[in-house]
């Protein structure tokens, strides 16, 4: 049985959230972002905000570094990096490569296994019909990690992300 690291009540609902454990919210986040990348008509804003809202500060730092080295170009620009689905696939592989390195040094880090092909990932998400709210665990972790007394820039980041998410969700 895993340990719950946060318990909170919002709008009368009791939540138990393993807020920093990427095993809890990681898969949920990737599913949400891959669905948006492949199925949304305008995914760029959400994908560009992804690095700023991850619940784990180490994940935010790594993803910010990966995105700086491999930015998403605007859709329709003709650049190979203008394909949001392919771009996210490449960012996801960068994360997996980092995890593979870390798991050799730290047995607590889970090896993500081999990367699937882009074609397999695209086929999966293009055909996926979610039976639950995509990204629910990820979004709950964001909520649980939101500071009680946020700085104005933190509020602006969250608002920008949630507004962009509303446009594609």
Task: Provide a role label for each language-model segment.
Residues 2-169:
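Aromatic-rich, lipid-facing transmembrane alpha helices and their immediate juxtamembrane interface loops
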């Amino acid at each position: 049985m895993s340990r719950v690291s946060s318990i909170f009540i919002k709008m009368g609902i009791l939540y138990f959230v393993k807020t920093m454990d990427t095993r809890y919210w990681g898969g949920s986040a990737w599913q949400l972002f891959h669905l948006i990348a492949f199925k949304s008509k305008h995914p760029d804003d959400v994908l560009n905000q992804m690095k700023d809202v991850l619940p784990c500060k180490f994940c935010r730092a790594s993803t910010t570094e990966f995105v700086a080295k491999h930015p998403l170009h605007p859709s329709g620009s003709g650049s190979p990096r203008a394909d949001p689905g392919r771009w996210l696939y490449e960012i996801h592989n960068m994360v997996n490569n980092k995890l593979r390195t870390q798991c050799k040094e730290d047995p607590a880090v889970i090896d993500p296994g081999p990367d699937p092909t882009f074609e397999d990932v695209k086929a999966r998400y293009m055909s996926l019909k979610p039976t639950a709210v995509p990204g629910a665990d990820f979004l709950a972790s964001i909520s649980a990690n939101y500071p009680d007394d946020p700085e104005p820039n933190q509020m602006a980041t969250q608002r920008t992300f949630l507004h962009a998410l509303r446009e594609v969700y």
